[in-house]
Each structure stands twice: as structure tokens, then as C-alpha cells.
Swiss-Prot record:
Residues 107-150 are annotated as: Disordered. Gene3D superfamilies: Immunodeficiency lentiviruses, gag gene matrix protein p17. One of its GO terms (cellular component) is virion component. It comes from UR2 avian sarcoma virus. Keywords: Virion. Its main location: virion. Pfam families: Retro_M. InterPro entries: Gag_M (IPR004028), Matrix_HIV/RSV_N (IPR012344), Retrovr_matrix (IPR010999). Late-budding domains (L domains) are short sequence motifs essential for viral particle budding. They recruit proteins of the host ESCRT machinery (Endosomal Sorting Complex Required for Transport) or ESCRT-associated proteins. Gag contains one L domain: a PPXY motif which potentially interacts with the WW domain 3 of NEDD4 E3 ubiquitin ligase (Potential). The lineage of its organism: Viruses, Riboviria, Pararnavirae, Artverviricota, Revtraviricetes. It is found in: Virion. Residues 112-141 have a biased composition (Basic and acidic residues). This is Core protein p19. This protein is a product of the Gag-Ros or p19-Ros polyprotein. It comes from the Viruses.
Length: 150
């Protein structure tokens, strides 16, 4: 359990800064979660599937017992875990796009889906063939679009 506490503490220090919970607070929270049967192993904490049940159980505990310490700690830990997970995804995508994936192929994200030609031209700042008047003529008066100025 000590290794998990160190990893979580490090992530919290990185992503929570001065509000980071102490190792003692993290350890107490993990012990409570194991005692309550929400974690079979401390490493289960890394699984996003366990996050909602943990949040619900700690919220219920706060309402029944009025104890908010573990919920506050969990909120900080959860924020750090989500940030670390997002950063890892971003890092993996960057490696894939740069061809540094080491043979591991990841599916492209939604931003890699081919855009229609008109959207590509808009992204590049070119004019689109359809004018505002033509677009407005297709819409009902209450749906008239106001062109955005960039």
C-alpha cells in the first residue's frame, strides 16, 4: 500500500499544488475504502470504473456521519488522477502522431476524422462557396445566423 500512497501523493503534489493531501490523509482514505469493501487492492484506485462508487460512498458517509475529511481527500486525489490520466492520453497521442509509438498503434482520436472540404477551407481561413444570404434563405427567419467575426 505504501507504493500506491507514494504514487498518489506524487500525482497530488503535481496537480493539486499546495492543497495536496498528506500521505497520512491518503493512507487513511485508502484504509477506509478497503475496510468499506470499495477497493480490493489499493491499486484498484487507478481504475475509472471505481471512481463513481467511491464518490457516492464517501458522500453518503458525509451525510450520515458528518465526516468530510475523506471526501475532501478523495476529491483532490480524483482530480489528480483525472489530470494524470488525461496527460497520459495526450502524451500517447503525441507519440503516435510523431511516429514514436514503438510499434504500438492507437486508434486516432475524433479530431483525426476527415472533415468535409468546406470545414477544411474554413479552418484555413478561406471563403466558403455558400454566402451568408444563401444560408439565411434556407433558414426560417427566427433561425437566421449571425456571422461571427474572427
Amino acid at each position: 500500500m505504501e507504493a500506491v500512497i507514494k504514487v498518489i501523493s506524487s500525482a497530488c503534489k503535481t496537480y493539486c499544488g499546495k492543497t495536496s493531501p498528506s500521505k497520512k490523509e491518503i493512507g487513511a482514505m485508502l484504509s477506509l475504502l478497503q475496510k468499506e469493501g470499495l477497493l480490493m487492492s489499493p491499486s484498484d484506485l487507478y481504475s475509472p470504473g471505481s471512481w463513481d462508487p467511491i464518490t457516492a460512498a464517501l458522500s453518503q458517509r458525509l451525510m450520515v456521519l458528518g465526516k468530510s475529511g475523506e471526501l475532501k481527500t478523495w476529491g483532490l486525489v480524483l482530480g489528480a488522477l483525472k489530470a494524470a490520466r488525461e496527460e497520459q492520453v495526450t502524451s500517447e497521442q503525441a507519440k503516435f502522431w510523431l511516429g514514436l509509438g514503438g510499434g504500438r498503434v492507437s486508434p486516432p482520436g475524433p479530431e483525426c476524422i476527415e472533415k468535409p472540404a468546406t470545414e477544411r477551407r474554413i479552418d484555413k481561413g478561406e471563403e466558403v462557396g455558400e454566402t451568408t444570404v444563401q444560408r439565411d434563405a434556407k433558414m426560417a427567419p427566427e433561425e437566421t445566423a449571425t456571422p461571427k467575426t474572427v
